[in-house]
């Protein structure tokens, strides 16, 4: 009754909408799966933001007294005009970060400045040794400067740093066997909840401080007293840098998680719109098929 051409044409016309419908249904499943995944990630980022906000509030509260001690210790080098001798070449470079990520450019900014300092000091003929406080800074620099690493410290940033932690780091540096003449400690200084600045502060060895011209006016200072004060001074500066770095890290993580949550919301809105449009297209095609079939009858 029907010709072969007519049957072939009818078969093609009948199968094409079914293929499109299957394709659209698969697309809807993919979109639904992506929406579910993004919503789960958004829950995680919001939770991490809340945790970071609580840790940031504590870190900022503890930073104020630590900053007083740190700036007081640094004032000694400034007021006494202590400088590293030009003929001495041993330099110690300390980078302060932590073991945890998801906090923006906190760790990479420290690594970038340390690499720049290493290049500058090496070009000036200095012998540079590195100390990494935190596993992140060690992971970044160890690939390119493994031969210059003196010591690296882990388990940093999981708990609020204490003066005891700074004392352990200072004691480890003094007992490392590397008799540096001067050094620098690089850390992120907290400025506001959305801002921090990578800073570098000087540190000096006991011999450098004792042989400074400005220290000669204090004839009655005992050598043991000066040694104890210098060790305490080093621990103070490390403690100050740890507190500054921790506060900067928590504020940066809070900002990063807030941005991630906002980006997730935007993606959810776009995918929801795409889902609705695709579903509407499927419904429209099904209605066209029904109407066309009814008209053919």
UniProtKB/Swiss-Prot annotation:
InterPro entries listed in its UniProt record: ATP_synth_F1_ATPase_gsu (IPR035968), ATP_synth_F1_gsu (IPR000131), ATP_synth_F1_gsu_CS (IPR023632)
Residue positions, PTM N6-succinyllysine: 49, 115, 154, 270
Residue numbers carrying Phosphoserine: 146
A Pfam family it matches: ATP-synt
Membrane topology note: Peripheral membrane protein
One GO cellular component term: proton-transporting ATP synthase complex
Transit peptide endpoints, chain numbering: 1-25
Compartments it resides in: Mitochondrion inner membrane
Role this protein plays: Subunit gamma, of the mitochondrial membrane ATP synthase complex (F(1)F(0) ATP synthase or Complex V) that produces ATP from ADP in the presence of a proton gradient across the membrane which is generated by electron transport complexes of the respiratory chain. ATP synthase complex consist of a soluble F(1) head domain - the catalytic core - and a membrane F(1) domain - the membrane proton channel. These two domains are linked by a central stalk rotating inside the F(1) region and a stationary peripheral stalk.
Entry protein name: ATP synthase F(1) complex subunit gamma, mitochondrial
